[in-house]
């Protein structure tokens, strides 16, 4: 995708915030528990390569991604010897590519292991479906059979076993405890304990540090975002958001009563008012549902009016502003702030989606 360096819309990533979130999490982990930085989906919209570099500087011992291509991008960017685990499903025909690049793969079907052609040992993490209902084996019998199959092939290594919690970001823990018990039953059924046993995502690592096992997968909270609003007041330390989104007014005009703006003429001025056009739209991740939300101009709230367009958005100004004035979509401005959580609440979604939607057409600038 083309990145818009010649357009006054940009994202700022505070690397110091990422480092602080990692350090605070590491301070509460036992010394023998590694922290793996989850950098899938372009690091939740923050930029995979720069975030990976920042996380490694802060002490992360490895990385988790969703697809093999993300793992290969890290290798190509210079992360040659770092642990990398692909959490999602990988095609069988790509197993050799992963093996040659020393990339660990998630496996959850015995038939996937049959008739592999490998030029290097393949590191495998067995995924257990303890209650998420996505990928994973569900029985002791499946686990034992896969362990036997791996042991019979000297090109296969059972490096890890893991699961993913569906409700770790909730205060009620009964389902979480059921999942943990199911996972432990399968774990103890193995003849040999793998090198890495890991279960904790951000929420679990923050609220249930006792189940760290050998490593945690630190994702959303590395970026300073709360796993859910429900647990926000129960966190052991303050998270520092790393992402801010800015743009500038490219056209400022005064509307007369009866003037309408944007597609469908859904907004009509009822009095004389100032509006500004912003060079950002739903093609950038500022989806149409943002209509009716607000931004900050000079620290004051300014509503988004009319329909958000593919490349442009219109806001109602509290007064006349100069063309080129800075606009804050996510971030702080003169003592006021709009957070990813604020946007998520308005959009009836989660903060993960808000930042992941911000695509690579918006340039990232890395600070500190």
From Swiss-Prot:
Molecular functions per Gene Ontology: alanine racemase activity; pyridoxal phosphate binding
One annotated GO biological process: peptidoglycan biosynthetic process
N6-(pyridoxal phosphate)lysine sites (modified residues): 40
Cofactor section: pyridoxal 5'-phosphate
Catalysis performed (reactions): L-alanine = D-alanine
Similarity remark: Belongs to the alanine racemase family.
Name of the protein this chain belongs to: Alanine racemase
Species in which this protein is naturally found: Listeria monocytogenes serotype 4a (strain HCC23)
Lineage of producing organism: Bacteria, Bacillati, Bacillota, Bacilli, Bacillales
């Amino acid at each position: 995708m083309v990145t818009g360096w010649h357009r006054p819309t940009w994202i700022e990533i505070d690397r110091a915030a990422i480092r602080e979130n990692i350090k605070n999490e590491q301070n509460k982990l036992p010394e023998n528990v590694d922290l793996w930085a989850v950098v899938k989906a372009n690091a939740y919209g923050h930029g995979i390569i720069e975030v990976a570099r920042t996380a490694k500087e802060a002490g992360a011992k490895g990385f988790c991604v969703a697809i093999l291509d993300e793992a290969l991008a890290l290798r190509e960017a210079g992360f040659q010897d770092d642990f990398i685990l692909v959490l999602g499903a990988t095609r069988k025909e790509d197993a050799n590519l992963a093996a040659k690049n020393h990339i660990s793969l998630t496996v959850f079907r015995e038939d996937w292991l049959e008739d592999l052609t490998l030029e290097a040992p393949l590191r495998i993490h067995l995924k257990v479906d303890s209650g998420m209902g996505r990928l994973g084996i569900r029985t002791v019998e499946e686990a034992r059979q896969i362990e036997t199959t791996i042991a019979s092939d000297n090109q296969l290594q059972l490096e890890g076993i893991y699961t993913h919690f569906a409700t770790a970001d909730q205060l009620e823990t009964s389902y979480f405890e059921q999942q943990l018990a199911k996972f432990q039953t399968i774990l103890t059924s193995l003849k040999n304990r793998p090198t890495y046993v890991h279960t904790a995502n951000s929420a679990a690592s923050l609220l249930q540090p006792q189940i760290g096992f050998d490593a945690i997968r630190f994702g959303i909270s590395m970026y300073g975002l709360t796993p859910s609003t429900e647990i926000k007041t129960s966190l052991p330390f303050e998270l520092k958001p790393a992402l801010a989104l800015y743009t500038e007014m490219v056209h400022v005009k005064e509307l007369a009563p009866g003037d309408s703006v944007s597609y469908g003429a859904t907004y009509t001025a009822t009095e004389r008012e100032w509006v500004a056009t912003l060079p950002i739209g739903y093609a950038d991740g500022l989806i149409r549902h943002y209509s009716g939300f607000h931004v900050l101009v000079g620290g004051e709230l300014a509503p988004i009016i009319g329909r958000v367009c593919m490349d442009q958005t219109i806001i109602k100004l509290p007064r006349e502003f100069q063309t080129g004035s800075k606009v804050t979509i996510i971030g702080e401005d003169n003592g006021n702030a709009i957070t990813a959580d604020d946007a998520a609440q308005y959009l009836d979604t989660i903060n993960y989606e808000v930042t992941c939607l911000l695509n690579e057409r918006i340039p990232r600038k890395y600070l500190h």
